[in-house]
Design a protein with these regions (language model features):
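Conserved acid/base catalytic micro-environments in cytosolic active-site loops
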Residues: 1-121
Length: 121
């Protein structure tokens, strides 16, 4: 398992095994940084993607959930988010696997990693 952090005012995508850092695009409306990243992850790593949608504004990420689901990935969404529009839009897609508190999301990710480790041994 790996965790990657995006630099401020940038966007990330993955092609093959290489992350690419892009200048932040600013189309009309809300940015689509999470949508770009999730679509590229689904294409690059398939069923190993776990999309986690946390508190946030707008619908960023929701447009990519079909790609995550089609690749066999999992989708987790934060319940009780202080800024709930990103989780709400994700839930409205009908593609979400689990709606959890942040601590439950952390535990679920740990369990997923343990399962992956067992499968790769």
């Amino acid at each position: 398992m790996a965790v990657f952090l995006c630099p401020p005012n940038k966007e990330l995508s993955l092609t093959g095994s290489t992350f690419h850092v892009h200048p932040k695009s600013t189309p009309l409306g809300w940015p689509r940084s999470i949508t770009l990243l999730l679509k590229s992850l689904a294409a690059a790593v398939g069923n190993r993607v776990i999309a986690v949608i946390l508190s946030g504004m707008g619908a960023d990420g929701s447009a990519a959930l079909m790609a995550v689901k089609a690749s066999g990935g999992r989708i987790l969404v934060q319940s009780g988010a202080p800024y709930g529009s990103m989780p709400r839009y994700a839930i409205e897609t009908g593609l979400v696997d689990r709606i959890l508190t942040p601590s439950q999301i952390a535990a679920d990710l740990v369990n997923c990693c343990k399962l992956i480790d067992r499968q790769t041994v």
